[in-house]
Amino acid sequence: MSWKKRNYANIYKKSLAVQKRNEKEVETVREEAELHQLILSVGQRVGARAIGLSGSRTDPQAPKDFLQDFDVVYVMDDIQPLVDDPSWLEAFGPIMIRQTPEASTIYPPSLGGCFTYLMHFLDGVRIDLMLCPLALVDRLANEPGLQPLLDPDQILSFANQANHSHYWIKRPTQAAFQEHCNEFWWVSTYVVKGLLRKQLIYAADHLYTICWQELLWIEDLFVAQAQQFQVSTGKNHKYLQSFLTEKEWRELTSLLDFSTITACGQSLLKMQKRFDKQAKNISEKLGLAYDWQEAENVQAYTKYWSEKNWQMEPENQK
């Protein structure tokens, strides 16, 4: 059968149907209490000295649903045997897909001696399991919301179960504010260049990966300053919508149309207008200097080419 003709929804359902637990078919996500017990039992079986849970599962402010990851850490005397032979992970259940970032050949290691197994199971459960050598346990001190699940030797005594302030949006310095604003306006000119050359992917890539991200950064600041910088909009700004009115949300998401040269150009113009407005608001509320002349110059440049329908003069095409 051609891969184009496969019904992947049915394939997934069939893969669920073959799972067995207590001789019964499993087609639902396992309960949180059951997962906690499983995490403890597997950890004890492999010799974990301490077991901790962090992330959104320990954050009382995080919305609760079955899609929340279980961010788990096993503190081990020696993690290498568990890295060399991952067969012990089978005890958690059938895995749909797995990643091991610290073993990646395309990205450099980032945990300095710890190792993670990122696992998405067939029933929908997601566990991000970090193996931390006992000698490196101090590195967990800044793990947001770390909550000991098993710690007979008080290895995780430094854990602060209620501390999620690590996630709070930080008040920017003058230098940081200036650099973020400059980056937005500077990269705007790359988008214009791509539009004039009819290089849609080039233009859209710069608009989304840089300009859009800088806009979200300043949207976060506007939210945070109203909350005395004691708030988080979540990873990848996933909670930002809850701080905006329906109108504001529609206006923001309308900027994500990069499907044509014209649409991408309109998104750039609207994005610039919104960024400029929010930057001025932040400048006033936080007492930060904003280079309005830089902003006006780039907006005028963008508007000039927009009014020419992103068409270069013939003499400039040579």
Question: Where in the sequence are the language-model features?
Answer:
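Conserved NTP/Mg2+-binding pocket subregion across the NTase superfamily
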Residues: 12, 19-25, 94-202, 206-208, ...
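Metal-dependent nucleotidyltransferase catalytic core
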Residues: 19-46, 54-67, 72-130
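Short aromatic-enriched loop/helix-cap "lid" or pocket-rim segments at secondary-structure transitions
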Residues: 64-66, 141-143, 233
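Conserved nucleotidyltransferase catalytic core and NTase-mimicking acidic/glycine-rich helix/loop elements
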Residues: 168-318
